Amino acid sequence: MSIQQNKRPVVIGVTGGSGSGKTTVSNKIYDQLHGQAIQIINQDTYYNDQSDMTMDERKAVNYDHPLAFDTDFLIKQLTDLRSNKAIEMPVYDYTQYTRSDKTVHVEPTDVIILEGILILDDERLRDLMDIKVYVDTDDDIRIIRRIQRDMVERGRSLDSIITQYLATVKPMYHQFVEPTKRYADIIVPEGGENQVAIDLLSTKIRDILVKRGHTELR
């Protein structure tokens, strides 16, 4: 579905701690709005370019701190998408702990879901969102999910995951991530298992789309 100039994209911010179920919530919203042009952008894509650092230096970075992200670049590109301009989105290489040389061409869509642990930390970024969602999940469940994900999808050892969790992930969650809950419009307990919250969010997004001229949804 093409997007007209007067139909500004709806931006949904989905945040919460690592392993909280952000991706599941985002994917379920995506599935419910399958009739619309919709895309998910992950904040991890905007980790800083660290190509000038050694591998040891890259591994020592605190990736759960706001300064680990190139937030200015994310704001610029999200602003472009909201203005119906295409972008060349960076690609992050988890195996090399830095940004890849590749980019992905991204066109503006009716709905943009921005997902990440610290997307509500910066006021400038919050101001670009129409709906801000915080996925609230118990710490024990989150660490179990993180272990499963990082071992299977990112090839990491159990020891390295636990070390990072205790050193940075857990303390940064309580220092930076959890406090952003106060900025959320909607708090979703139980993550992707909360179908009522998913349905309410999808209905609200459709309502915003109609108000912006998507009369085909009436």
UniProtKB/Swiss-Prot annotation:
One of its GO terms (biological process) is CTP salvage. Keywords: ATP-binding, Cytoplasm, Kinase, Nucleotide-binding, Transferase. It catalyses: uridine + ATP = UMP + ADP + H(+); cytidine + ATP = CMP + ADP + H(+). The keyword Cell division does not apply. The keyword Endoplasmic reticulum does not apply. Its EC number is 2.7.1.48. GO terms for cellular component: cytoplasm. InterPro entries: P-loop_NTPase (IPR027417), PRK/URK (IPR006083), Uridine_kinase (IPR026008), Uridine_kinase-like (IPR000764). Gene3D superfamilies: P-loop containing nucleotide triphosphate hydrolases (3.40.50.300). It is found in: Cytoplasm. ATP binds at residues 16-23. One of its GO terms (molecular function) is ATP binding. Pathway: Pyrimidine metabolism; CTP biosynthesis via salvage pathway; CTP from cytidine: step 1/3; Pyrimidine metabolism; UMP biosynthesis via salvage pathway; UMP from uridine: step 1/1. Its main location: cytoplasm. Belongs to the uridine kinase family. PANTHER family: URIDINE KINASE. This is Uridine kinase. It comes from Limosilactobacillus reuteri (strain DSM 20016) (Lactobacillus reuteri). The gene is udk.
